Amino acid sequence: MCFVRTIAFGATLGLACAATQATAQEKSFKEAIIGPWIITAVFDEYQNGEKKDNWGGPVKGQITFGRTGRFTQIIVGPAVASMKSDDPRKPDAPVVAYYGSYTVDEAGKKVIGKVESASYSPRANTESIWTVQGSGDKLTLIGSPRKDQHGTFTPKLEVRRP
């Protein structure tokens, strides 16, 4: 009788552990993106299919999605000699930095950011939408179309977990 109880207890424990493991693996889209992401590459894809590195070399940066619906993003390109100054408040490299609040579209795997302030002032008080591709520790964030001196482009950020 004790043997039967031991087997029944073991089977119940095994099922409980399996159910807990399955629940832990089934994260929502929002839960999966929360936290810091290191930016490993950035490129802009123009309407004609051309891909450009408008940064002049490798970038460094991070985007963070907080549990409370807040986000920050900063991308810093390589230093440019002509941008150097003695004022530490003036960057000597291309910089894109902004922050604000965000919501998610679970079904569409999209992040909708409401930019509150930015290093490029016309971006303040605008909406930015990223479609997210990939899973796990590596993602690609595809931004909403923008315009620059070369035309309309879609920014793409490749990110990984730290």
List each language-model region with its residue ranges.
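Bacterial N-terminal signal peptides that target proteins for export
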Residues: M1-A11
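Lipid interaction determinants
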Residues: T12, T20-P162
